[in-house]
Amino acid sequence: MTITTTGLTRAAGLSAAAAGLIFIAVQINHPPMDATSVATTEWVVRNSAKVLMGALALVGITGMYLRQVRQAGLLGLIGYLLFGAGYLLMFSTEVISAYVLPGLVDLAPGYVNDILVAAAGGTPVGDIGAMATVLAVTGIGYMVGGLIFGIALFRARILARWAAVLLSVGTIGTASLALLPESFNRPMAVPVGIALIGLGISLWRDQRSPADAIPQKHAVQTASIEHASV
C-alpha cells in the first residue's frame, strides 16, 4: 500500500464530511443537559460519537489548510490554529463528558450540573474550577477560529465557497445562543455540520480531478503521435 499526499488529502476530505454528518446526527433527540441524562447509556454513546466527531474534524480541517496553505496566507494560518484549538479542546471536553462525568453523578451531582450549565453557555451556581476557562476558550476558538478560517477558505477560491461562507456564519452565529431560547441550541449546529460536509466533499473531489485528467492527457498525446506517424 502506497501512501500518497493525494490519498491523505482525500482521506481528510472524507473525515471532514463524516464529522459534519455526526455533528448533525448527535443533535437529533438530544437528551436534556442534566445529571439525570449523564447517568444513562445513551449519554455515553452519544458523547462517544462527539469524541469521534472532534477527531475527524481535526483531521479534516488540517487537510483543508494544507491543501491551500499558500493561498490562505497568514489569515488562513491564524484561522486554522484557532479553529483547530477549538476542536481539540472540544474533543477533550467530550472525553470528559462521555467518560468522566458519568462516574461523578452519584458523588457530586451538583458539580456535574454546573459543568453542563456552563457548557450550554449559562452561569453555574457553584465553582467548577479550571473547566470554566476550558469551556470559555473552547467557545472562542470554535467561533472566532471558524469565522476566520471560513473567510480564508473563501478567499483561497479552491474549495466550495458556499460552504466556506456557511462555516463562518454558522460558527460565529453560535454567539447568538446567549440571547436565544434553549430550543435553538441544537438547530444552530446544523449549518456548521452542512459546511463541514460541503468542504469535505469539495476537498475529496478536488483531489480526484488531477488524477482523472492524467489518463485523458496521455490519450491525447498518444493520439497525436500516432497521427503524426501516419
Model-derived features with residue positions:
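Hydrophobic, aromatic-enriched alpha-helical segments typical of multi-pass transmembrane helices
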Residues: 1-230
